[in-house]
């Protein structure tokens, strides 16, 4: 071998990545069959299905250094109903993924959509172990064949090189990879004759909104997009100096949470009344006050602080000390501070104990802690039943993906930096998709007790879509009395399914 033919250090470094991708793509699909018990009472039905878990390659495009080579192996898990004749390949198909952005699809898979689910207590708290799956009578399998996707570096999915990893851990690179996975899956299973839907949760709505537009570039016009706990416009969610939007958009959620925990008085001690009062205050007074900023008089500041305190359950003096701007961290650690407890972020009905030395930053989110262990244990047991090798670790949540994510828009340069700037916002993509595809419909679901992606922030994001009145009619927004993963509450699991069925019937 000549010197020029010797592998470089970079090539040697990438060999384990590429070997991992090649090994996964060479594995045979895992297949099994089962019967889903869907519905309750006289409406109950049994649906026989085939289960297929397999890796789908993300193939490099013609602009990459090695066009045609797989740059990732992405794990997919599909439930395909038995059907007669042509119905087998024409049944509506739903692709689903979660967010993070470093999360696997386990939450939607075993929380709401799939034929099995993990039980969580009615009030959002953690049940006692051990954990296992149970039948899900409100599975969406009644309406669609289901395909769950784990993006690169979640679940069992991996990229083939460091350069590919950098691309995939970015807003647009992630969208391109998942679009290719869906296209390839449709081709492999000959399902281009099916109506195609997407469902995304949290950051999955960020990617879902962008995919509605991206899939059109690949010749796939979606019939519908379902957005659960929206995070399309990060400016509405990120508390940062100079960005006043979250202070106003979180207040109705703060009010709902404070009322739930018994911190509001008088007429505000009613869930609906507290939300309505906070929404009205934001529109009529708070946004104007934030706009005026330092020009407010002392009397005006005092009056505003008093009202914000009444709505949030926090002392007016604290509100004034915070310059009339309550952050999520302040709310989480202050609302129940006298009880030594911290409020949950993703499920604010849940609270957890503070350390004896009470800090001012959230040590952990009791809302998410309540579900991680049950889901992690249950999914491994369920995968073993399906014949999936659980010796390989299934990444429920990959914190390294979250930490290494590139939030700008545009291509990644050689140093892993993005050409874009500002807050990530895919409402522009969804707006364009609604203009390009006259048949695209959107269903949105928000929890009143979600302080990660508050319902009021979603209201704002939807109102900012660059569409006309007729296009806006193709969007429905429904609300639930739980948090980010509202489907962990059985009543809202059923309501979500009922809202979906009614939405589909109106098509």
Predicted segments with their positions:
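Catalytic histidine neighborhood in serine/cysteine hydrolases
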Residues: 467-484
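N-terminal cap/lid subdomain of alpha/beta-hydrolase-fold enzymes
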Residues: 6, 10-16, 63-167
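Catalytic histidine-centered segment of alpha/beta-hydrolase-like enzymes
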Residues: 481-493
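Alpha/beta-hydrolase fold catalytic core
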Residues: 293-446, 451-452
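Alpha/beta-hydrolase fold nucleophile elbow
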Residues: 190-203
